[in-house]
A protein has these predicted regions:
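RNA-interacting cores
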Residues: 1-197
Length: 197
């Protein structure tokens, strides 16, 4: 029930939908089998994280109830789930992005066509848009708390287009995101929600 709500609806704040979870790419390196397929020798693993405890619990319970599921036409068996302790966040931390960080804005060009601009780390508005996104996510989770004094900035520490620019196609849309190492500075609440979701 929770999984279908997340997939179909998400959590809503100011008419914007948020999934409030994230997951890494598969950590093991696969062997390229075709243009769209990778082969993995044995097991695969990945990280899953959410700012909502019920989402994590629902995923864990679902995996144990159905230890087998379908992934791109292949049967996959769950052998182990490990719960990791959340780090103790300070107001300045270094973080390695295991899932690409995607920052974008949508606008209309002179002909009325919808355009999307994906921002690169260090580009103007990158840090500001990340902060706005984190505030909206935090407000979705903690609607009763005041977020006027919360702030967050991001600084790329070890990021290069050759190694860290990730481009994927999803539902006929090209999406750009960035992995790499970043410094997050600001309110612990926003650092936490950025880390978890």
């Amino acid at each position: 029930l929770l999984a279908s709500k997340l997939h179909n609806q998400g959590y809503v704040f100011e008419n914007r939908r948020f999934k409030l979870f994230t997951f890494s790419r598969i950590l093991e390196k696969g062997i390229k089998h075709s243009k769209s397929e990778l082969l993995f020798k044995r097991s695969i693993s990945f990280y899953f994280s959410s700012a909502i405890d019920d989402i994590v619990c629902d995923l864990g319970e679902g995996c144990f109830k159905g230890m087998e599921f379908n992934l791109s036409g292949q049967k996959v068996f769950v052998s182990r789930i490990e719960v990791l302790t959340l780090p103790a966040f300070e107001e300045k931390i270094l973080i390695r992005m295991l899932a690409p960080l995607t920052i974008y804005s949508t606008f209309e060009d002179g002909n009325g066509n919808k355009k999307t601009h994906y921002y690169a780390p260090g580009e103007i508005n990158f840090s500001e848009l990340l902060e706005k996104n984190a505030i909206k996510k935090f407000s979705t989770i903690q609607a009763d708390l005041n977020y006027d004094n919360l702030q967050l900035s991001v600084k790329p520490i070890k990021v290069s287009p050759e190694r860290n620019l990730q481009v994927v196609r999803f539902k006929n849309t090209t999406i750009q995101g960035w992995t790499g190492i970043y410094e997050l500075f600001g309110s612990r609440e926003l650092i936490t929600v950025t880390y978890e979701a």
